[in-house]
C-alpha cells in the first residue's frame, strides 16, 4: 500500500469506516438526459466504488449496461454484483485495454477533484473513440458549502479521511469555477444541480453507527438500510427544494451534465 506523509492513500485498506451511498441527484440527471431516451444505454462509471450508483441505475433502467472502473480490489469485487462488467484498475489502465464499442454516458462521481490536471483529463475524452459523443455526468464536492465557509472563517483547514477535505483531493471547486473549467475543457453545460448538505454534515455520526458493518466489508450498509430509504423518501426531497434556493451555499456537491462541443 502506498503512503504519503505517513498516511495510507487507500483508506479502504485501513480501519477507517468508509460508508458508501448512492448519489441520487447524479442518477436522476443520468436518467433525464440519457436513460429516458436510451434505456439500454452503455455507461462507464469511473471510480464506481462498491457499486452504489450502479445499483440505482439498474433499478431505473434494467436494460442499461454499466461498466465499472475501480482501482480498489475489495470495492471492485462488491461492484460486480451491480455492474455488467468491472475493470479493476485506473481509468488510464482501462483506456489502455482498448474497450470495444461506443458508450452513451461517462459518470465521474467525485473523481475530478482527485486529478492533477482536470482540464487535460476532460479534454482527453474527445480523443477516445469509445467515449466520443458520450454525455458527461459528473459531481464534485462544493468548496462553497455553508459549513466550509464557517471553517474557513475560523481559519481551519485540516485534511480528513473523507468529505471536502479528503486527503486525496488535489483540486477544489465552486459552482462557478466548475462551469468555467467545463467550458475551458471544450464542454457545453447542459444542466446543473446540487446535492443537499445535511446528511453529509452528519458523516462522523454515520460512520460510528455503521462501523461494525464496514469492518465486515459491508460498505453499502447505509445505502441498504431502512433509515436511508426513509431519508430519501421523506427528508431528501424537502432538503433538495431548500438547497435549490441557494445551491452555491447549501449544496454539498455540484452535479453537472455536459456534452463535448
Label for each model-derived stretch:
Residues 1-101, 105, 119-122, 138, ...:
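Conserved N-terminal segment of class I S-adenosyl-L-methionine
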Residues 144-169:
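Short, glycine-/aromatic-enriched active-site segment of Class I SAM-dependent methyltransferases
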Residues 105-117:
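A short SAM/SAH-binding and catalytic strip from SAM-dependent methyltransferases
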Residues 170-185:
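Short alpha-helix
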Residues 132-140:
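Conserved beta-strand signature within the Rossmann-like core of class I S-adenosyl-L-methionine
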Residues 115-116, 129-132:
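Helix-to-beta-strand junctions that scaffold the AdoMet/dcAdoMet cofactor pocket
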Residues 120-128, 181:
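Short, conserved SAM-binding segment of the class I
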Residues 187-198:
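Conserved S-adenosyl-L-methionine
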Amino acid at each position: 500500500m502506498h503512503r504519503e506523509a505517513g498516511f495510507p492513500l487507500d483508506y479502504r485498506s485501513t480501519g477507517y469506516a468508509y460508508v458508501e451511498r448512492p448519489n441520487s441527484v447524479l442518477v436522476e440527471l443520468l436518467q433525464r438526459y440519457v436513460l429516458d431516451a436510451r434505456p439500454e444505454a452503455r455507461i462507464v462509471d469511473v471510480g464506481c466504488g462498491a457499486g452504489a450508483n450502479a445499483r440505482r441505475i439498474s433499478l431505473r433502467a434494467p436494460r442499461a449496461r454499466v461498466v465499472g472502473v475501480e482501482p480498489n480490489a475489495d470495492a471492485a469485487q462488491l461492484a460486480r454484483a451491480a455492474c455488467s462488467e468491472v475493470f479493476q484498475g485506473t481509468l488510464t489502465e482501462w483506456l489502455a485495454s482498448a474497450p470495444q464499442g461506443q458508450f452513451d454516458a461517462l459518470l465521474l462521481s467525485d473523481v475530478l477533484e482527485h486529478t492533477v490536471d482536470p482540464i487535460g483529463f476532460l479534454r482527453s475524452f474527445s480523443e477516445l473513440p469509445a467515449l466520443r459523443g458520450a454525455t458527461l455526468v459528473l459531481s464534485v464536492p462544493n468548496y462553497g458549502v455553508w459549513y466550509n465557509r464557517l471553517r474557513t472563517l475560523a481559519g481551519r483547514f485540516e485534511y480528513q479521511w473523507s468529505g471536502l477535505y479528503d486527503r486525496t483531493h488535489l483540486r477544489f471547486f465552486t459552482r462557478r469555477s466548475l462551469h468555467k473549467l467545463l467550458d475551458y475543457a471544450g464542454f457545453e453545460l447542459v444542466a446543473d444541480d446540487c446535492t443537499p448538505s445535511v446528511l453529509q454534515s452528519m458523516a462522523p455520526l454515520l460512520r460510528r453507527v455503521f462501523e461494525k458493518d464496514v469492518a465486515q466489508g459491508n460498505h453499502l450498509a447505509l445505502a441498504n438500510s431502512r433509515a436511508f430509504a426513509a431519508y430519501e423518501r421523506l427528508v431528501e426531497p424537502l432538503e433538495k427544494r431548500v438547497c435549490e434556493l441557494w445551491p452555491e451555499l447549501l449544496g454539498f456537491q455540484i452535479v453537472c451534465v455536459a456534452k463535448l462541443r
